[in-house]
Amino acid sequence: MTDQRTAWGWGLASVDAAGNTLDVWYPELKLGEAPKEVARPNHNFGNLAHEGVDVRGVRRIPVFTVSKLDEPIEDAADAYLRLHLLSMRLAKPNTLNLDGIFAALNNVVWTNYGPFAVEDFALRKLDVMAAANQSAPGLPKADVNVLSIDKFPRMVDYVVPTGVRIGDADRVRLGAHLSEGTTVMHAGFVNFNAGTLGVSMVEGRVSQGVGGGNGS
């Protein structure tokens, strides 16, 4: 019987007013058995974390996540950890159990101000614009621009792998695996649990579960 594969790390979760996890960002992840609570390293999120809600209606909470990689996904924090593993090149496509990922992830409004809950987006957008105007009345402010409404965010907002070129960041999802030497052209698209395994140029769609070899 093989040992259970495990990964762990501190993440910064965005949680809406209803208690739903909108996203989790993991700056660093480790493979192997997680340390016991008394031996855990401290997170370094500082004042990025806040228990009170911001103008988006979102709290940002540090979460320590341990993922059993051969078992189905337990929750959103677990799902985000596995997506980060793929984009950080700590796991290759089709090597992680991703059962339950769609049920674990919430549909989110992804914007230039970060993630919003879908249900009260219009009202929260007004709150954000009003707060921006109060901070510097009379000056033009960036509108709340919706980038997508989806369960999966852009990879580059969470992980920026070395040695790659990406023509259009909107077309590479978190959970894409891009090896060193990969170029994703403007028309290319790379889904989660998909990508490249060597020096490659992506000019079309790389669907979930597909990996291109060196020189493809």
Kindly label every feature range from the protein language model.
Residues 1-157:
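Terminal amphipathic alpha-helical/low-complexity segments used for targeting or macromolecular assembly
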Residues 159-216:
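Structural signal for interior beta-strand "rungs" in well-ordered beta-sheet cores
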